Curated annotation (Swiss-Prot):
Homology family: Belongs to the UPF0313 family.
Bias-annotated ranges (Low complexity): 610-624
Cofactor note: Binds 1 [4Fe-4S] cluster. The cluster is coordinated with 3 cysteines and an exchangeable S-adenosyl-L-methionine.
Basic residues composition-biased segments: 600-609, 632-645
Residue numbers spanned by region Disordered: 598-645
The protein, known as: UPF0313 protein CLK_3381
Family annotation (InterPro entries): Elp3/MiaA/NifB-like_rSAM (IPR006638), rSAM (IPR007197), rSAM_horseshoe (IPR023404), UPF0313 (IPR022946), UPF0313_C (IPR024560), UPF0313_N (IPR013704)
Residues of the Radical SAM core domain: 295-566
Organism lineage: Bacteria, Bacillati, Bacillota, Clostridia, Eubacteriales
Organism: Clostridium botulinum (strain Loch Maree / Type A3)
Length: 645
């Protein structure tokens, strides 16, 4: 592929296209990948379809102002995002340790973007072009649109609109708002006059003319009073609906952050149009010498079938970004994309995924949503399935069957996550059977997250007995179809509500599983989630009940160690945790014990004289039998963070 297959990135590209001045320039923290899994590509191609010229400045050197000037000054403004992931999540682990890799950067190396990329980029653009409008969007801007708790600062920060000095913020999926805003700019409207576009947030000095709005506790209140913070979050949480949601206002000193109601969901026709745009479907050739962009490997042969999720897991901020209403593509659109993939020279016959935030949520949760929107204080699948919930996998199954029949397609995997509770609600086992028979490769990844009902309730997840029933059914089906396939559970430590007692309960469950899971991670308090509000305030904002929060680093390390109690390096922490919790009965050689009385010696490999730092012990734990199951799935914590359902 040549540069002409991509949006322009240089003055040479502009010259070849006879462009003197670009209409918009996108500045992004990710490398430039022209694929519909990347927001920069979608927004760029949508604007191109509308007749605008768009250039890309990917991962500029924030210490060099000239990098922000290399495409000149745009006619209408700059569009700024941090990339597909919040830059702080991208840079730091849950324990605040610096990451050394970045799948969205050349060669998978870190260091190509700054911390708090949106703020840094906006400041540099203002320095380069003082009067050029700046519109911010993407996950970092979207989830920080109000005053928010910032885990890395361990304090409440102002709206990112205040800190970045941007002119307008587009939150959520931005296709509709960016088209409306760009057309208003084309018609001659000034950026500071654009105040009525849904899905946007702006700063206002005077709100006397504003109508039908809710004012939430101010920045000054939420930064000093945790009850006020919880109250502000609850109102935000309840109003994220395009039909019933109201305008929200939050005072910041003498100014106001104003969030217009969310944009309406894209129709099926609109979704089809977005995914049919002329993407190059790979990274820009300028990265080839550096080893390419690793993130493309996971998505190049994956298909987005829908957006949105009504699962409402407390630790997921999707409600604030994609929303609870499912927006799906037509089968024809998806089949065209699958057929196109089979003609790509590096296609090997495997489609890696057909799904979305939750693979088996292919349609709206109920008919009520179409007229009245999502329920304000009621969830679709938690704590139990709503009576109006439509439980049906038939359409999704028919889609998968059609893709399987496409010539040159050997296998169609589902990797984006299955909601096992929704699967269990379906009395028709046809989808479950074909899932096991055709769409997994030896193992299915699921996200029970915990097994303590107290913790699960705060997570917004189904009770333990639902997961237990699912596990039994999964193995029963595999036995019937003569397949020896495993489950790989995602598990989380230190979530609000999880004390040592709950962590030990989970460790005992893992003991009965018979192997040590690799897919575990500490709770990560990221912006925008219900769980993050619990973490900061110690309050469940929806019930106003107090919540125990494990914040002490020693206890957090203990909880994580308990989830991998059979790893020798965790022995001391596990023993200390068991003694602290008065569970010495779990120390010893009995069948229910987690660890032996005495710490075993590490075995060393005499051949190369290197110690094996991942030794396992405890003959009563049948880990070795299934060790390959977890070993195959060892991934960096960033990808685990993305894939939880």
């Amino acid at each position: 592929m040549s540069n002409m297959d991509f949006l322009p990135i240089s003055k040479e590209d502009l010259k070849k296209r006879n462009i003197d001045v670009l209409d918009f320039i996108v500045v992004t923290g990710d490398a430039y990948v022209d694929h519909p899994s990347f927001g920069t590509a979608i927004i760029g191609r949508v604007l191109e379809r509308e007749g605008f010229t768009v250039g890309i400045i990917a991962q500029p050197n924030w210490n060099n102002i000239e990098d922000f000037k290399k495409l000149g000054k745009p006619k209408y403004g700059f569009l700024v995002n941090s990339g597909n992931i919040d830059s702080m999540v991208n840079h730091y682990t849950a324990s605040k340790k610096k990451r050394h890799d970045d799948f969205y950067s050349p060669g998978g190396k870190s260091g190509y973007r700054p911390d708090r990329a949106v703020i840094v980029y906006c400041n540099k653009i203002k320095e380069a072009f003082k009067d050029s409008p700046i519109i911010i969007g993407g996950i970092e801007a979207s989830l920080r649109r109000f005053a928010h708790y910032d885990y890395w600062d361990n304090s409440v920060r102002r709206s990112i609109l205040e800190d970045s000095s941007a002119d307008l913020l587009i939150y959520g999926m931005g296709e509709k708002p960016i088209v409306q805003v760009s057309n208003l700019l084309r018609y001659g409207m000034k950026i500071d006059s654009i105040k009525n576009v849904r899905g946007t947030t702006y700063i206002e000095k005077d709100i006397s003319s504003l109508k039908d709005y809710i004012e939430i506790p101010s920045f000054e209140e939420v930064s000093t009073n945790k009850k006020s913070y919880a109250e502000a979050y609850k109102i935000q949480y309840y109003e994220q609906d395009s039909i019933r949601g109201k305008t929200l206002v939050q005072k910041h000193k003498e100014r106001y952050v104003v969030q217009n109601p969310p944009q309406p969901p894209l129709s099926q026709e609109e979704m089809d149009e977005v995914y049919a745009l002329p993407y190059a479907r790979t990274y820009h050739p300028m990265y080839e010498a550096e080893g390419g962009i690793p993130a493309i490997k996971e998505v190049k042969f994956s298909i987005t079938s829908h957006r949105g999720c009504y699962g409402s897991c407390s630790f997921c901020a999707l409600t604030f970004h994609q929303g609870r209403v499912i927006q799906n593509r037509s089968q024809d659109s998806i089949l065209k994309e699958a057929n196109m993939m089979t003609n790509m020279k590096d296609f090997k016959g495997y489609i890696h995924d057909v799904g979305g935030p939750t693979a088996n949520f292919r349609h709206r949760a109920c008919k009520v949503q179409e007229k009245h929107g999502t329920c304000k204080n009621k969830q679709c699948v938690f704590p139990k399935a709503c009576k109006n919930l439509i439980v049906d996998h038939k359409e999704y199954l028919s889609l998968l069957r059609k893709i399987r029949k496409i010539p040159n397609v050997k296998k169609v995997f589902i990797r984006s996550g299955i909601r096992f509770d929704y699967l269990m609600y379906d009395k028709n086992d046809e989808f479950f059977k074909e899932l096991c028979e055709h769409h997994i490769s030896g193992q299915l990844k699921v996200a029970p997250e915990h097994i303590s009902d107290k913790v699960l309730n705060l997570m917004g997840k189904p009770t333990r007995n639902v997961y237990d029933s699912f596990v039994k059914k999964y193995y029963d089906i595999n036995k019937k179809i003569h397949k020896n396939q495993f489950l790989v559970p995602y598990l989380m430590s230190s979530h609000p509500g999880s004390d040592l007692k709950a962590a030990i309960e989970l460790a005992q469950y893992i003991k009965k599983m018979g192997y040590t899971p690799e897919q575990v991670q500490d709770f990560y308090p990221t912006p925008g989630s219900l769980s993050t509000t619990m973490y900061y305030t110690g309050i469940n904002p929806l019930t106003e009940e107090k919540v125990y929060v494990p914040k002490d680093q020693k206890e957090k390390r203990m909880q994580r160690a308990l989830l991998q109690f059979s790893i020798l390096d965790n022995y001391d922490l596990v023993k200390e945790a068991l003694i602290k919790a008065h569970r010495e009965d779990l120390i010893g050689n009995g069948p229910d014990c987690l660890i032996p009385y005495n710490k075993p010696y590490k075995k060393s490999h005499k051949k190369n004289n290197v110690k094996n730092n991942n030794n396992h012990y405890n003959k009563n734990n049948n880990y070795n039998k299934n060790k390959d199951v977890s070993k195959k799935n060892k991934k960096n914590s960033l990808s685990k963070h993305k894939k939880r359902k």
